[in-house]
């Protein structure tokens, strides 16, 4: 069955859990259409209530003084060197003043997002477009009454960022290594936040959002090695210092019951009758490896909490998954679904951040509806832990509010 080239993601490829040849390599969902490079004007849908916004051919919004009427036969005049692009300045200011404070989970990371990365973006258009896209996405999240307008700007900047990043990645070097690394992080935040902000979350096929996020996180695994040495020698080296691979973890859980639970869980993932029926022994190995890596991520998260960091390494597990695991997840096989439900426990520890708000509950709900009933007992532990974290955050909020 051929790719039907349907956006945001073709249904044929989704049903077969195969990579879509029509989407770009990052595979992001975009509900809004990209601005047409051949036209200086965006074209909102009829009846949307939003007037057309003038763009130049690089995808940047033009100052109103340089706009040309839509029915004008004259070509778009180049903007004056003195013209200020207020829409871009608005987004950049918001990113530096507001968004940067709610991206990084550590003080060291927040300072990098606030100062270092915007400075790097001044020399790399693809990173600047990505920054503006995430800023617009954040504003759309904060201002529901203006969500449509800012989502259109989000999609336009993200499309342009992806286009320019492909060329930069093909020519990776010391000069653009930090920009590529920063971009890869922004794309992950974008992937988690965009379905809810755009309104596509309820319309997507089961687990489509989770599969997309995992796929993008896995992409970092291939992007980083060629540029890692340059990043380690540059201003973003401190971000690599908090990578899970650089953190020590315990060999077993402090809580004996948790240790016993994960021992049973590893047995389930290694001997599932569902997989034995199909004799797909390679898949059994992949799920067993995924379960073992997930246990290691929980141990690292427990050790990080003891060390005083405010959030666990939430992407470590997804980054190490094999492509075969994603294929089984796309087919909604039980063991991958149960594993993602357990990953949600780690993600729930950062649920206060805007870019992941609602993601855990939505994904857990989809898994509960999709998972065969005989496996539902394996949702009890992750659902209990997510509920405990929800109650802890609620109590913490009440404590702060009363202080």
Residue ranges and their predicted role:
Residues 151-166, 189-232:
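Structured all-alpha helical bundle cores of eukaryotic regulatory proteins
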Residues 111-114, 157-170, 314-329:
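Short amphipathic alpha-helical segments and their helix-coil junctions
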Residues 35-72, 397-403:
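Intrinsically disordered, low-complexity Ser/Thr- and acidic-rich regulatory segments
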Residues 119, 209-228, 235-403:
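C-terminal effector modules of eukaryotic transcription factors
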Residues 14, 86-100, 120-143, 156-160, ...:
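Amphipathic alpha-helical regulatory regions
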Residues 1-27, 120:
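N-terminal cysteine-rich, zinc-dependent DNA-binding domains of eukaryotic transcription factors
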Residues 107-111, 143, 195-203, 232-239, ...:
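Structured alpha-helical bundle/scaffold domains in large eukaryotic membrane-trafficking regulators
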Residues 24-34, 55-153, 166-171:
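Internal amphipathic alpha-helical repeat/solenoid segments
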């Amino acid at each position: 069955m051929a790719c039907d080239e349907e956006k945001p993601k073709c249904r044929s490829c989704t049903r077969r859990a195969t990579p879509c040849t029509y989407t770009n390599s990052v595979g992001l969902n975009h509900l809004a259409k990209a601005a047409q490079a051949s036209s200086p004007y965006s074209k909102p849908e009829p009846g949307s209530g939003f007037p057309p916004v003038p763009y130049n051919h690089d995808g940047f919004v033009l100052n109103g003084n340089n706009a040309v009427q839509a029915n004008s036969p004259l070509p778009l005049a180049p903007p004056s060197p003195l013209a200020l692009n207020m829409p871009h300045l608005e987004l950049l200011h918001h990113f530096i003043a507001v968004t940067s404070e709610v991206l990084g989970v550590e003080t060291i990371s927040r300072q990098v997002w606030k100062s270092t990365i915007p400075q790097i973006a001044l020399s790399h258009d693809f990173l600047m477009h990505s920054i503006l896209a995430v800023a617009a996405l954040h504003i759309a999240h904060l201002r529901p009454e203006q969500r449509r307008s800012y989502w259109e700007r989000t999609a336009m900047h993200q499309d342009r960022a992806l286009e320019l990043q492909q060329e930069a990645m093909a020519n990776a070097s010391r000069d653009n290594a930090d920009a590529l690394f920063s971009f890869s992080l922004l794309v992950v935040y974008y992937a988690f936040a965009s379905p809810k902000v755009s309104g596509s979350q309820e319309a997507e096929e089961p687990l489509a959002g989770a599969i997309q996020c995992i796929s993008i996180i896995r992409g970092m695994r291939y992007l980083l090695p060629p540029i890692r040495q340059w990043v380690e020698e540059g201003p973003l080296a401190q971000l690599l210092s908090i990578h899970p691979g650089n953190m020590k973890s315990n060999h077993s859980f402090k809580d004996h019951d948790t240790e016993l639970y994960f021992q049973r869980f590893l047995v389930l993932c290694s001997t599932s009758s569902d997989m034995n029926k199909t004799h797909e022994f390679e898949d059994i190995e992949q799920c067993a490896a995924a379960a073992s890596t997930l246990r290691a991520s929980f141990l690292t998260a427990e050790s990080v909490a003891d060390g005083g960091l405010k959030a666990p390494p939430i992407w470590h597990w997804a980054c190490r998954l094999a492509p075969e695991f994603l294929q089984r997840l796309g087919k909604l096989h039980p063991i991958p679904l149960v594993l993602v439900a357990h990953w949600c426990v780690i993600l729930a520890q950062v649920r206060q951040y805007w870019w992941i708000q609602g993601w855990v509950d939505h994904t857990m709900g989809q898994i509960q509806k999709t998972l065969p009933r005989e496996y539902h007992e394996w949702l009890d532990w992750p659902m209990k832990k997510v509920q405990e974290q929800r109650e802890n955050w609620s109590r913490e909020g009440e404590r702060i509010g009363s202080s």
